[in-house]
Regions:
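Conserved, mostly hydrophobic/aromatic
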Residues: 29, 61, 92, 103, ...
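Acidic-and-aromatic substrate-binding clefts and catalytic sites of carbohydrate-active enzymes
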Residues: 11-21, 40-55, 79-82, 118-124, ...
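Charged helix-capping and loop-helix junction motifs
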Residues: 20-21, 50-56, 89, 93-96, ...
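Active-site acidic/histidine proton-transfer and metal-coordination neighborhood
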Residues: 24, 60-63, 82-183, 190
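Acidic/histidine-rich catalytic cores of soluble enzymes
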Residues: 37, 71, 136-250
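A cross-domain feature marking catalytic cores of carbohydrate-active enzymes
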Residues: 5-14, 39-43, 70-75, 113-115, ...
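N-terminal pre-domain/capping segments
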Residues: 1-105, 139, 176, 180, ...
């Protein structure tokens, strides 16, 4: 599947099914027009811990006539760029370096990573301290990625440490071809102003993270466009991160797709629709059909 001449890769919550079912799900994606999968964060954590799993995964992907094309880095406070705990930083950086090697070895072009919000959410750690930690992490990772030919893609999210401004700060600081942005359309929609949008309707998670008043960011794509190398595509109602099918929420898809098609450094786009949320009522086939229609 292609979008404006760029490959489309598909996310799936593999942790909720047994390995015996992996190939069937891969074949279902293939039979509905997909040909590329994302190495999701759970897969990469498993690969780092179990080389036999990596070999088995390569075999299953080959037998299903699919390809691996993107990586989502392991995430959480112990993996995020902004990890400040010195006892964890060494293993975290080494883990990402190994993961980048696996990304290159499998032919994956992008490595999406989070700045991270866990430390802020739990301890209200000062954002300048988190920013400095993220810079130090990227000081180590960017030269490594450049040697491997993989682009680290920093993802925008919806918490104070992960705003478009914070992403831009990191990208402009390094100004490296090995560092770009993963534009997350769903996250941007949660943070975007819209006619009639009301602060009191934000979900409890957003209210707590922002201490009761969400600072909204208009036109995140326009601001990030020069740096966008890949994108996470999913929908929501503007108030919570639902990872729903495009068309089921309030994302303005014609505007977003037009903007993505014009991004000068775009490598790929990704479906990040979540099948593990009952309210989404989606299957691999339904996801593929929706994206095929969206890109037609």
């Amino acid at each position: 599947m292609q979008f404006s001449g760029h490959p489309v890769s598909f996310f799936y919550p593999w942790r909720f099914i047994s390995r015996e079912l992996y190939r069937s799900v891969m074949v279902d994606f293939r039979d509905h027009g997909a040909d590329r999968l994302v190495i999701v964060q759970e897969w990469m954590e498993r690969i780092l811990a179990d080389h036999v799993f990596y070999l088995d995964l390569l075999e299953m992907v080959r037998d299903a006539d699919m390809k691996l094309f993107e990586v989502h880095a392991p995430n959480g406070p112990h993996w995020d760029l902004s990890c400040v705990f010195e006892g964890r930083r060494g293993p975290m950086i080494e883990g990402h370096k190994r993961a980048l090697c696996y990304a290159a070895e499998t032919g994956c072009r992008t490595y999406t990573i989070h700045i991270g919000a866990g430390q802020y959410n739990r301890f209200r750690m000062p954002i300048p301290k988190l920013r400095e930690a993220a810079l130090r992490t990227l000081d180590e990772l960017v030269p490594h990625a450049e040697k491997l030919g993989v682009v680290i893609a920093v993802e925008n999210s919806f918490e104070p440490p992960n705003t478009p401004d914070e992403v831009l700060f990191l990208l402009e600081h390094f100004n490296s071809p090995a560092l770009g942005c993963c534009y997350d359309a769903g996250h941007a929609n949660v943070m975007a102003p819209a006619p009639g949008k009301r602060q009191e309707l934000y979900c409890s998670v957003m209210k707590e993270i922002w201490d009761g008043h969400v600072i909204e960011y208009p036109d995140a794509l326009g601001r990030l466009a020069p740096h966008v190398v890949t994108a996470h595509l999913h929908d929501n109602d503007g108030y919570r991160d639902a990872h729903a099918l495009p068309g089921s929420g309030s994302v303005d898809w014609p505007v977003i797709l037009s903007g993505l098609a014009a991004c000068p450094n775009l490598i790929s786009v990704q479906s990040e629709v979540h099948c593990d949320r009952a309210e989404n009522e989606v299957t691999p086939g339904r996801i593929c059909r929706k994206f095929a229609d969206l890109f037609a």
